[in-house]
C-alpha cells in the first residue's frame, strides 16, 4: 500500500497514512540466532554443499555453477525453489537474474523495484514481498489470489501484465510490466483536479478494465488513485490485485470487510453481502475525486467519514456537466440494488451519456490519444515517481536469498503456504 505525504495546501488535500503500521511491521528486520547462524555458514560453503549428507540436511541440489556461486552474492538455490510448485513452476528463476536499480514503490509486505534483466536487458517492475510479514498477517490467500488474477490479466490493455513469478526461502517475486508514467494519485496531488474530458478518458479506461475483470468473475475491491498508473503514453494501467475476489458469478456476493476507507461502499461498511457493484461505487468515488480534488464523503475523522458514506446525501457542486452529475449520482447510489451497473454491469456504464464521446473499440485498441502525455524519455526517467521511494537505497538482500533460515520451522511453513506461486509463460506465448 502506497504511503504518501500531504501537499502544502491542507484545505485541498487529505492524509493517506493508512497502512503505516503494516508497512513498518513488514520491513522490520528479522532476528537470526543460534542454529540459523550455523546453517548460514554451512549453506554458503560451496565445498560443504557438494557433500551428499549436507545436501540431505539442507535439501539442496548440487551447485550447477561453482564459479558463479563464488563470484555472485546470491547463495545456492533454497528449498522453496526445489519444492513441487505445480505445472507452471519456474525453478530456474532467481534474484541474481536481475540488476535492481531503484526503489519505485512500497506496500504493506514489501517493495517494488525497477530492475533490468541481465540476459535480455529488458526493464521490469519487480514486486518483492516478505513471506514472514505475509504469514504474520495471514494474507497468503490474498497473495496467491493476486498471482492468479495477474495470470488472467496479461492480455488486457489496461491491466498490468505478469511476466513470471518465483520465490526464494524468504521472499516472493512478481516480475511485472514496468510502468513509469506515475500514479494517478501523484498527478492529482500536483494538479488538484482534472478537467472533465481528461477525467472521462481515465474513467472510461478504468471502467473497461473493471468490466473485463467482472467478465472473469473477479471483483477488484480496491480501486483508488494509488492503484491506477499511467503508462509512458498516458494510458491507464490498473495494478495491485491483492484484494481481488475470484469466482463471483454475476448474481454472486461476498462479505469480507476490505478496501480503503475513503472508497468503501455503504454495504461494505454495513458488513452486508456485496457484489460486483462495489467496484462501480469505487469508480464513482475516483471520478468524483478527479473532478473535485477529494473523495465524495471525505473527512479527516474516519468515524465521521464512515457516517458520511452511510448517511450523508451526495453533494455535487455546479461546475460539472449534467451528464457527469447524472453518472456520479448513479455510481454513488447508496443502495446497491439501484446503483448503475446493478443489472447489466459494464454495459450500463459504457452506454451512459457521459461516455458518448468515447469510441470503445478505439479506446481498447489504444487508438484514442490520451489527454496527458507523461513525456518520459526512457526507462530510467523516474520523474513521475515519488522521491520518497527513489531516494531510498536498494536493500542488498533484495538480490539474494539468505539461506540462514533454511532449517527453521517458519520457512518450512512459508514454503508450504506458497506452493504453486512460481510461474513462467510457455514458449508458445513468445511465438
Swiss-Prot record:
Domain AGC-kinase C-terminal, first and last residues per copy: 356-431
Protein keywords: Apoptosis, ATP-binding, Cytoplasm, Endoplasmic reticulum, Kinase, Nucleotide-binding, Nucleus, Phosphoprotein, Serine/threonine-protein kinase, Stress response, Transferase
Cellular component aspect of the GO annotation: endoplasmic reticulum; nucleus
Predominant localisation class: cytoplasm
Residue ranges, compositional bias (Polar residues): 81-93
Region (Disordered): 58-93
Family annotation (InterPro entries): AGC-kinase_C, Kinase-like_dom_sf, Pkinase_C, Prot_kinase_dom, Protein_kinase_ATP_BS, Ser/Thr_kinase_AS
UniProt binding sites for ATP: 104-112, 127
Protein name (Swiss-Prot/TrEMBL): Serine/threonine-protein kinase Sgk1
Species in which this protein is naturally found: Fundulus heteroclitus (Killifish)
Amino acid at each position: 500500500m502506497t504511503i504518501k505525504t500531504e501537499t502544502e495546501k491542507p484545505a485541498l488535500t487529505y492524509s493517506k497514512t493508512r497502512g503505516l503500521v503494516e508497512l513498518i511491521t513488514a520491513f522490520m528486520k528479522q532476528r537470526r540466532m543460534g542454529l540459523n547462524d550455523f546453517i548460514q555458514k554451512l549453506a554458503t560453503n560451496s565445498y560443504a554443499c557438494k557433500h551428499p549428507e549436507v545436501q540431505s540436511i539442507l535439501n539442496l541440489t548440487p551447485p550447477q555453477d561453482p564459479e558463479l556461486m563464488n563470484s555472485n552474492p546470491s547463495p545456492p538455490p533454497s528449498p522453496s525453489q526445489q519444492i513441487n510448485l505445480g505445472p507452471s513452476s519456474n525453478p530456474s528463476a532467481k534474484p541474481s537474474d536481475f540488476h535492481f536499480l531503484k526503489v519505485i514503490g512500497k506496500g504493506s509486505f514489501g517493495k517494488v523495484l525497477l530492475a533490468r534483466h541481465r540476459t535480455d536487458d529488458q526493464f521490469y517492475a519487480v514486486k518483492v514481498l516478505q513471506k514472514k510479514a505475509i504469514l504474520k498477517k495471514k494474507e497468503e490467500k490474498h497473495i496467491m489470489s493476486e498471482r492468479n488474477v495477474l495470470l488472467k490479466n496479461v492480455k488486457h490493455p489496461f491491466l498490468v501484465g505478469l511476466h513470471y513469478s518465483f520465490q526464494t526461502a524468504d521472499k516472493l517475486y512478481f516480475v511485472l510490466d514496468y510502468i513509469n508514467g506515475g500514479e494517478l494519485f501523484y498527478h492529482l496531488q500536483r494538479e488538484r483536479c482534472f478537467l472533465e474530458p481528461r477525467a472521462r478518458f481515465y474513467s472510461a479506461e478504468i471502467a473497461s478494465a473493471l468490466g473485463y475483470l467482472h467478465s472473469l468473475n473477479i471483483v477488484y475491491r480496491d480501486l483508488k488513485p494509488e492503484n491506477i498508473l499511467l503508462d509512458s503514453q498516458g494510458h491507464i494501467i490498473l495494478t495491485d490485485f491483492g484484494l481481488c475476489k475470484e469466482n463471483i458469478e454475476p448474481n454472486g456476493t461476498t462479505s469480507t470487510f476490505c478496501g480503503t476507507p475513503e472508497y468503501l461502499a455503504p454495504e461494505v461498511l454495513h458488513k452486508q453481502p456485496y457484489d460486483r457493484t462495489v467496484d462501480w461505487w469505487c469508480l464513482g468515488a475516483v471520478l468524483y475525486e478527479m473532478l473535485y480534488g477529494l473523495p465524495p464523503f471525505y473527512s479527516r475523522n474516519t468515524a465521521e467519514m464512515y457516517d458520511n458514506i452511510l448517511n450523508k446525501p451526495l453533494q455535487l457542486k455546479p461546475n460539472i456537466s449534467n451528464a457527469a452529475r447524472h453518472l456520479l449520482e448513479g455510481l454513488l447510489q447508496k443502495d446497491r440494488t439501484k446503483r448503475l451497473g446493478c443489472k447489466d454491469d459494464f454495459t450500463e456504464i459504457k452506454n451512459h451519456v457521459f461516455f458518448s464521446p468515447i469510441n470503445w473499440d478505439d479506446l481498447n485498441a489504444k487508438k484514442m490519444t490520451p489527454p496527458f502525455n507523461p513525456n518520459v524519455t526512457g526507462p530510467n526517467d523516474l520523474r513521475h515517481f515519488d522521491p520518497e521511494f527513489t531516494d531510498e537505497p536498494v536493500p542488498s538482500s533484495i538480490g539474494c536469498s539468505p539461506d540462514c533460515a533454511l532449517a527453521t520451522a517458519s520457512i518450512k511453513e512459508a514454503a508450504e503456504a506458497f506452493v504453486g506461486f512460481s510461474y513462467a509463460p510457455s514458449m508458445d506465448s513468445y511465438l
